[in-house]
Amino acid sequence: MNTLIYLIPVALSLGGLGLVAFLWALKSGQYEDLDGASWRILDDGDGEGESSQTL
């Protein structure tokens, strides 16, 4: 029972820290372009301005 006196504030502190980190990520734009990374994987990189060399 005495351990709950320590564990409950620790759990609430970690939850609050996670919430602050999530809100910071939202504010800094980490979730703005969710589809961009999946499309960049499929891009072969043969766009303008890039030199394509064959070996």
UniProtKB/Swiss-Prot annotation:
The chain crosses the membrane at residues 4-24. Its main location: membrane. The four proteins FixG, FixH, FixI, and FixS may participate in a membrane-bound complex coupling the FixI cation pump with a redox process catalyzed by FixG. It comes from Rhizobium meliloti (strain 1021) (Ensifer meliloti). The gene is fixS. GO terms for cellular component: plasma membrane. GO terms for biological process: nitrogen fixation. InterPro entries: Cyt_oxidase_maturation_cbb3 (IPR004714). The keyword tRNA processing does not apply. The lineage of its organism: Bacteria, Pseudomonadati, Pseudomonadota, Alphaproteobacteria, Hyphomicrobiales. It is found in: Cell membrane. Keywords: Cell membrane, Membrane, Nitrogen fixation, Plasmid, Transmembrane, Transmembrane helix. This is Nitrogen fixation protein FixS.
